[in-house]
Amino acid sequence: MKRRTARERAMQALYQMDITGELEPKVAVENTLDEGEETNEFLESLVVGFVDNKEEIDAAIRQNLKKWKLERISIVDRSILRVAVCEMKYMEEIPHNVTINEAIEIAKTFGDEESRRFINGVLSNIKDTL
């Protein structure tokens, strides 16, 4: 599984967990996989990394939102931001610009017309604080 695919699957897993409010991370990851597709370590580390550090990740996002509340952001955009911030804060071997570019590409696929600019702005602000 390519890293872009793993990031997309992680975003989808966080989306499911956000909607249901009670889905276990392992189940959410399994729900994103195609039939016969296996998970990988990167995907699982993104999802578990978010679950283990949810308060810190959400706080970093909240501190960099202008005129928005985290709860008012679309679930898709919130999930993309959470995956990207998890990667930026806890996977130091991945350059922040790569993470931001990947998040923008995922936003182009899954978000609305404003998503990519919004996500780019928030993540760029977070990058400056790390």
Swiss-Prot record:
Keyword match Ribonucleoprotein: no
One of the record's GO molecular function terms: RNA binding
Presence of the UniProt keyword RNA-binding in the record: yes
GO process annotations (BP): DNA-templated transcription termination; transcription antitermination
Family stated for the protein in its record: Belongs to the NusB family.
Name listed for the protein in its UniProt record: Transcription antitermination protein NusB
Annotated InterPro entries: NusB-like_sf (IPR035926), NusB_fam (IPR011605), NusB_RsmB_TIM44 (IPR006027)
Function per UniProt: Involved in transcription antitermination. Required for transcription of ribosomal RNA (rRNA) genes. Binds specifically to the boxA antiterminator sequence of the ribosomal RNA (rrn) operons.
A GO cellular-component term linked to this record: cytosol
PANTHER family: ANTITERMINATION NUSB DOMAIN-CONTAINING PROTEIN, N UTILIZATION SUBSTANCE PROTEIN B-RELATED
Position of the signal peptide: none
HAMAP family: NusB
NCBIfam families on file: nusB, PRK00202.1-1
Keywords annotated in UniProt: RNA-binding, Transcription, Transcription antitermination, Transcription regulation
